[in-house]
UniProtKB/Swiss-Prot annotation:
One of its GO terms (cellular component) is cytosol. The keyword Ligase applies. The gene is thrS. Homodimer. GO terms for biological process: threonyl-tRNA aminoacylation. Residues 1-61 form the TGS domain. InterPro entries: aa-tRNA-synt_IIb, aa-tRNA-synth_II, aa-tRNA-synth_II/BPL/LPL, Anticodon-bd, Anticodon-bd_dom_sf, Beta-grasp_dom_sf, TGS, TGS-like. It is an enzyme of class 6 (ligase). It catalyses: tRNA(Thr) + L-threonine + ATP = L-threonyl-tRNA(Thr) + AMP + diphosphate + H(+). Its EC number is 6.1.1.3. SUPFAM superfamilies: Class II aaRS ABD-related, Class II aaRS and biotin synthetases, TGS-like, ThrRS/AlaRS common domain. Keywords: Aminoacyl-tRNA synthetase, ATP-binding, Cytoplasm, Ligase, Metal-binding, Nucleotide-binding, Protein biosynthesis, RNA-binding, tRNA-binding, Zinc. This is Threonine--tRNA ligase. The lineage of its organism: Bacteria, Pseudomonadati, Pseudomonadota, Gammaproteobacteria, Pseudomonadales. It comes from Pseudomonas savastanoi pv. phaseolicola (strain 1448A / Race 6) (Pseudomonas syringae pv. phaseolicola (strain 1448A / Race 6)). Catalyzes the attachment of threonine to tRNA(Thr) in a two-step reaction: L-threonine is first activated by ATP to form Thr-AMP and then transferred to the acceptor end of tRNA(Thr). Also edits incorrectly charged L-seryl-tRNA(Thr).
Length: 640
């Protein structure tokens, strides 16, 4: 009979087979009531599952991340229960867990409306109040097919067909509703009280636009009402910071249907873009990078050699001219190898760091496009380092330091790092992989940085480091990448002459810091809610006259600041000064300079901030010095 070992090392012996729920009850009634599921010998199981042999057991409650994900998964099933009661002809598809929530894809004769979503949520609440048990039945394959055939659940039957080797499957019963799942799920609907449906969207069966369209119902679920309220508050704050709304309000950019996934940059937005580009160009130049420019449209033959034509063709825009096939480049790496290959290199010329602000295009699904965060046309701060194996660690360490310095300049100090190591299918010897992984790990260790190890998650051609930054709302954005590549230099015949006069393939380090300018600008807009630090602000100062008598001096101030390298403009409109101040405050201009008769007489400007602080009057030269100091701090003033 089983002896159960608990996480604290204590043991409990039973003279009969027990379920996870039985063990929880033997510890205490409170724990039994809170039990969502169990983890037996490291495997998640339902609370009703039996333990027949000696095992380790962790009781899973809503306080555990696994418990929260189980609650969310069960809420997806609850969506199915409610939908089938309200819309009996609907056919259920899949309902997985996602970050902070869940969704369910549903086939129905018409699109769901916000009123439908409200009705589904209300019915879910009514079902939760019934406090019913969720019943699990491990069911033979033939019987599963009978169950879903009788219910006309065509998509469930297709999913069964996808699992030809599964002879028994878990069916979970919510009263009259039944769903199929590996589980585990909550034992009772009382765990599902803290949920909310959040949005509706379209989707496609198996994610393929060629297949039938489905309705997707999104929701979130939490362990308690307090967590749910905090999440809703974060979402409301995120909606206030939506880069699409702020971008329109501040006149930064727009998108339109005639060019899906492409950005129309307006003067203010393009100024911001250029500030980023000029900053990154300076950073790269100071760190030994050589800037290059490569073609946008490249013959199919190069993409075949690189492997992109075979593995990435669906994401590439292609064209034809004079009986030749071309692709608009989706990435820059093959072209950078062509630059490296011009003239045989010596080991003395390595490392060679080639950088490009490379415009790329990828045929992303239209449903996945999102403002400037997910686009089809974008520019990467892309670079490739060609080096020897002995140089991998030093180059990696230098890049890590550079990346963190850049993020700090933009105001991001909370950075998460992940090291992904060799997958089962890979190219290159184990010895080379060992050296590469050790190089990346040592580079991270030498920087004193904690990181998450992700075994088996590397690309087939080399290990990688991912850099993710946290914004002011605690959201995590994966931006930077350092990817070692043993494969592409071989495929594209990149070689150098080594110290012993033999020819060797260099190691290629793919690296990006911002990722893409478009997405990074979107992150900045939402992080700062459009109130950029002075060094990034498209307009750093606006000069406003009170009456026409001060117009000439206002123009002089604008000229002086512009000649000092600042982005300043005058507002000489015949409007009340309060109106002008309010308008430019809403446009998030960092500094508002007011000029009246006294300022003309004293040759000064009255300085206000967009936050409403009155900095008093000062000579123009003094303000220029003040602004220069603010610009020099970049985004660090709020983080140090």
């Amino acid at each position: 009979m089983p002896t159960i070992t608990l996480p604290d090392g204590s043991q409990r012996s039973f003279d009969h087979v027990v379920s996870v729920a039985d063990v929880a009850l033997s510890i205490g009634a409170g724990l039994a009531k809170a039990t969502v599921a169990g983890k037996v010998d490291g495997k998640l199981v339902d609370a009703c599952d039996l333990i027949e042999n000696d095992a380790s057991l962790q009781i899973i409650t809503p306080k555990d991340q696994e418990g929260l994900e189980i609650i969310r998964h069960s809420c997806a099933h609850l969506v199915g229960h409610a939908v089938k009661q309200l819309y009996p002809t609907a056919k259920m598809v899949i309902g997985p867990v996602i970050d902070d929530g869940f969704y369910y894809d549903i086939a129905y004769e018409r699109p769901f409306t916000p009123d439908d979503m409200a009705a589904i949520e209300q019915r879910m609440q009514q079902l939760i109040e019934k406090d019913y048990d969720v019943i699990k039945k491990v069911t033979p394959r033939a019987e599963v097919i009978e169950v879903f055939t009788a219910r006309h659940e065509d998509y469930k039957l297709r999913l069964v067909e996808d699992m030809p080797n599964e002879q028994a499957m878990g069916l979970y019963y919510h009263e009259e509703y039944v769903d199929m799942c590996r589980g585990p799920h909550v034992p009772n609907t009382r765990f599902l009280k803290s949920f909310k449906l959040t949005k509706l969207s379209g989707a496609y069966w198996r994610g393929d636009a060629k297949n039938e369209q489905l309705q997707r119902v999104y929701g979130t679920a939490w362990a308690d009402k307090k967590q749910l309220a905090a999440y809703i508050q974060r979402i409301e704050e995120a909606e206030k910071r939506d880069h699409r709304k702020i971008g329109k309000r501040l006149g930064l950019f727009h998108t339109q249907e005639e060019a899906p996934g492409m950005v129309f940059w307006h003067p203010q937005g393009w100024t911001l873009y250029q500030v980023l580009e000029q900053y990154m160009r300076k950073v790269q130049r100071e760190n030994g990078y050589l800037e290059i420019k490569t073609p946008q449209v490249v013959d199919r033959s190069l993409w075949e050699k690189s492997g992109h034509w075979a593995n990435y063709a669906d994401n590439m825009f292609t064209t034809e001219s004079e009986s030749r096939d071309y692709a608009i480049k989706p990435m820059n790496c093959p072209c950078h190898v062509q630059v490296f290959n011009q003239g045989l290199k010596s080991y003395r010329e390595l490392p060679m760091r080639l950088a490009e602000f490379g415009a790329c295009h990828r045929n992303e699904p239209s449903g996945a496009l999102h403002g400037i965060m997910r686009v089809r046309g974008f520019t990467q701060d892309d670079a490739h380092i060609f080096c020897t194996e002995d140089q991998m660690q030093a180059e990696s360490a230098a890049f890590i330091k550079l990346t963190l310095d850049v993020y700090a300049d933009f105001g991001f100090k909370d950075i998460e790092l992940k090291l992904s190591t060799r997958p089962e299918k890979r190219v290159g010897s184990d010895e080379l992989w060992e050296r590469a992984e050790t190089a990346l790990a040592s580079a991270l260790d030498s920087a004193g940085l904690p990181y998450d190890l992700q075994p088996g998650e590397g690309a087939f051609y080399g290990p990688k480091i991912e850099f993710s930054l946290k914004d002011c709302l605690g959201r995590v954005w994966q931006c930077g990448t350092l990817q070692l590549d043993f494969n592409l230099p071989i495929r594209l015949s990149a070689e150098y002459v080594s110290e012993d006069n033999s020819r060797k393939n260099p190691v290629m380090l793919h690296r990006a810091i911002l990722g893409s300018f478009e997405r990074f600008i979107g992150i900045l807009i939402e992080h700062y809610e459009g109130a950029f630090p002075a060094w990034l602000a498209p307009t750093q100062a606006v000069i406003m006259n009170i009456t026409d008598k001060q117009a000439d001096f206002a123009l002089e101030v604008e000229k002086t600041l512009a000649e000092s390298g600042f982005r300043a403009k005058s507002d000489l409109r015949n409007e009340k000064i309060g109106f002008k101040i309010r308008e430019h405050t809403l446009l998030k201009v960092p500094y508002l300079l007011v000029i009246g008769d006294r300022e003309v007489e004293m040759q000064t400007v009255a300085v206000r901030t967009r936050e409403g602080a009155d900095l008093g009057s000062m000579p123009v030269a003094q303000f220029a010095e003040f602004l220069a100091q603010a610009v020099s701090r970049r985004g660090r003033q709020d983080t140090e």
